[in-house]
Amino acid sequence: MKNFLCEDFLLSNETARRLYHEHACHQPIYDYHCHLNPAEVAQNRQFDNLGQIWLEGDHYKWRGMRSAGIEERLITGDASDYDKYMAWAKTVPQTLGNPLYHWTHLELRRPFGITNTLFSPDTADQIWHQCNELLATPEFTARGIMQQMNVVMAGTTDDPIDSLKHHKTIAEDDTFNVKVLPSWRPDKAFKIELDLFADYMHKLGEVADIEIRRFDDLLSALDKRLAHFDAHGCRAADHGIEIVRYAPIPSEADLDVLLARRLNGEVLSELECAQFSTAVQVWLGKRYAQLGWVMQLHIGAQRNNSTRMFQLLGADAGFDSIGDRPFAFELAHLLDEMDQTNELPRTILYCLNPRDNEMMATMIGNFQGGGIAGKVQFGSGWWFNDQKDGMQRQMEQLSQLGLLSQFVGMLTDSRSFLSYTRHEYFRRILCDMVGRWAENGEVPNDLSLLGPMVEDICFGNAKRYFEERV
């Protein structure tokens, strides 16, 4: 019987163990999509205590605490960091079977070195003091943790109107060897249905020094900001798409009318929203191809389901879930609009509903080519799927319907500096899956064949994919 979280955690056979310990575990981390605050890296934030670094902004933990009956004051309210931390300690023993239990103990092990101690109300004070002592040292600042965890690149998520001043500060500091690069998140520019769309057009116009009145004005403003992002090292865009919209692109004159009506406060029809969204996203995708960027499409979240809590706390507070709208037709046509002129950029497709895994794994095969290995990717298990079953399902379906060997692997998608252990979690699951294939005779039990593939999935593929500007 294995002990909990031993060195061979999640590794069920000898081949898996060798793949992990000899090939996977020492690979650097290329965290190409996250939600870290670049200001905290630029300023090298020193966290005051474990509660602060562990619970600030982590809606995974917040959802678990609510389910365990913790009152909101102890989650997002005005309670002290210590009281929130103790509420989390009360919650963790109730999370058995949930990845939160694994993640919590992995995060204590790395970087804090706490092993053989289960986190609970009984051990919480001891762990609090031990971790707080470490957090007061230079090795446990925001930058120190990234370096300890062997991170070589972190791709943040940034609005086109952002100044990117913090990325500039980081890039100019020769004492810090981790690349922190912006990623372009233009959702507010193509979601014309948003209540604050007109306000956003004004802000975008101010930053770009262009008054946005016509569709061409919008594209000119976006183009100026694309150049700004590119100059600051941006190599990826990310579109958060709750509903995949597609409609044939109307004339520019018609798009001018749609934009003018919306800026005047009119509510557009679903078809008109789809026309505008398609026009902007197709134009953006073609520009990404010209710049050599990667386009990421995160599809299928159903957001802000609780009106009461949205009004109280705003977005990204733990009240989102998996959507179930079909979107294969719209997605295929959206990608095809770019591909028809051979201007589809390298693209990663993520789905939140695992029902869509096989569809997505076959969709990517429609648009491969151009001599680029894995040009269109089926992204790693995202959000509610970045747990053992979800990640394994995604990789198995990719391997059966595409090429696992070209997969760009894991990303944290997190706001926390302690989330890098999710790369370890992913690597163990990957090695166990490939190891089982080998032990069952489904693939050759040849580490000279399997080892390099695992190394590429853990690091090499992502580095090549994001750094080759083609």
UniProtKB/Swiss-Prot annotation:
Keywords: Isomerase. The keyword Repeat does not apply. Pfam families: UxaC. One of its GO terms (biological process) is D-galacturonate catabolic process. Pathway: Carbohydrate metabolism; pentose and glucuronate interconversion. Its EC number is 5.3.1.12. NCBIfam families: PRK02925.1. Belongs to the metallo-dependent hydrolases superfamily. Uronate isomerase family. This is Uronate isomerase. It comes from Vibrio vulnificus (strain CMCP6).
